[in-house]
Amino acid sequence: PTGHYEWVSAPFGLTATPSAFQRLMTFVLRDHIQAGYCVVYIDDVCIFTKTDDPGEHLAKVEAVLASLAEHELLAKGKKCEFFRSEMEFLGFMVSADGVAPVPGKVEAIRQVPPPETVSQLRSFLGMANFFRSHLPAFSEVSAPLTDLLRHTTGGRQRLQWTLECDQAFQLVKDMLTSAPLLRHFDPGLRTAVH
């Protein structure tokens, strides 16, 4: 084969691809992000308005799509959802009311058995950590579980599971399955930092 070849899409397997693509998307959509109506995570783009005016929302969607087209980036129509009042975005349900974990994930959490190995515990804590913004005092509640990891070496090593560990595990599961809806920030309300 002779000639010049170049990628028309991001190649799989290159370790720098996600960070490079994130940087590209942030650059391309910077004006919309700074205007406060667009959120981007790699190839997931969320465009939102604070009013129920479909004309305002359409204008913002068109502006974002124009910015993408200007940089020769395409959005696949079958992967797009338009004019939704509620949607799943990065593992959360986002609506005008706020942000909450996706109900299907909550049900899966209820079914998780107590971990038996270091690897299973790390997996559970990683999943719980993803939702930590919804879990008040998460680090204190999960302390017996994270302390258990300090005394281990390998992923297949069996855990020295105690009653305290079991109570912490059940409490974290309960917190995850009843995680509160996080309201969108309102600068007009009193703000408390804990």
Language-model-derived ranges and their functions:
Residues P1-H194:
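Retroelement reverse transcriptase polymerase core
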